[in-house]
Amino acid sequence: MITMIYKGNRAAWAYIVARTKVMKSRLLKPEDFRKLLNMEFDEIVRYIGETEYKKEIDELGYKFTGPRLLDHALYANLARTYRKLIEVSFGASKFLIMKYLEKWDVWNIINIIRGKMANVQPEVVDDILVPAGERDMDFWKTLLVKDIEEIVKSFEGTPYYEPLSKIGSEDMSKIEDGLYKVYYRELLKLNPSDFAMKLFLDFIKMEIDIRNVKTLLRLKAEDATPDEIMECTIPGGYELTEEELRKLAAMPIDEMIKALEGYWFWNDVQIEGKEVAAVEIEFDKVWIKTISKRASNYPLSILPVLQYIVLKKVEVDNLRVLGWGKYYGLPSEEIERQMVIL
């Protein structure tokens, strides 16, 4: 019976892809971002306030100012957009969208716990939560008023309890790595029972590759040991298997970079003379191009929907970089280097 959920039909895929196409058409274009790069912060907020973000800018404008207004409005819009995507989908598409968006459960857990550790007011954390995963906003609001021990206890009986139970005995960055490992591990347990599911799982595995190659390069640059690197990687990649990762982690950085050139994600990547953050943006661009190509190859599938989900998050990230950069007077060229614009 579960395989029937995965199969769906052409008409069902055509419907959700058509809805997604309309939503995708409303995303800001590269020329919009280049226009925004020539504006001052207040002009940027006014400009964004006339786009898809108007509702959130208007609603939160009385509560926040400056880049915090932008942050909260962007995350609120992201949550609303993803919830709408779930609402208009059904069958196989709804199942897969919801599974993928469980990533935001991890985001919310991390932000709530980090907020508790830093004594941030619950209402401030509340505004950056994205209730797009398995749990609804009511659940996250109940956690906001609990202490860390009670929050951890709330996840007893779930896969996330294991990494969360180590809070206090391990660094928070390791807890975060553990939470994302659980998220991907649970996704990879899905059975590739038909072509729709295989496309979804290949997408997930390729996303893991992108995360892992970033981790490899970042930790190598920090002179981490092979064991330290492996602790931070996520098993189950598309080409970067655990065995491959172990070999790469043990290589000197120059040799490792040479070895990486044969993998799918190294197409047109230029890293010479670049800082790690700039290299990570190169891989983000490769990932977006790859998703776009695969979505075009399989237009009646989950891939165009996943492409939109990724592009929407990239748009929000770009607007945050732009807003904070302009607010603090960074040169436009420096801000643009930190953005993912194709």
Curated annotation (Swiss-Prot):
Cellular localisation: Cell membrane
InterPro entries linked: ATPase_csu/dsu_sf, ATPase_V0-cplx_csu, ATPase_V0-cplx_csu/dsu, V-ATPase_V0D/AC39_subunit, V-type_ATPase_csu/dsu, V-type_ATPase_csu/dsu_dom_3
The entry's keywords: ATP synthesis, Cell membrane, Hydrogen ion transport, Ion transport, Membrane, Transport
Primary localisation category: membrane
Gene3D superfamilies from the UniProt entry: ATP synthase (C/AC39) subunit, domain 3 (1.10.132.50), V-type ATP synthase subunit C domain (1.20.1690.10)
Biological role: Component of the A-type ATP synthase that produces ATP from ADP in the presence of a proton gradient across the membrane.
Name by which UniProt lists this protein: A-type ATP synthase subunit C
Source species of the chain: Archaeoglobus fulgidus (strain ATCC 49558 / DSM 4304 / JCM 9628 / NBRC 100126 / VC-16)
Gene that this polypeptide is encoded by: atpC
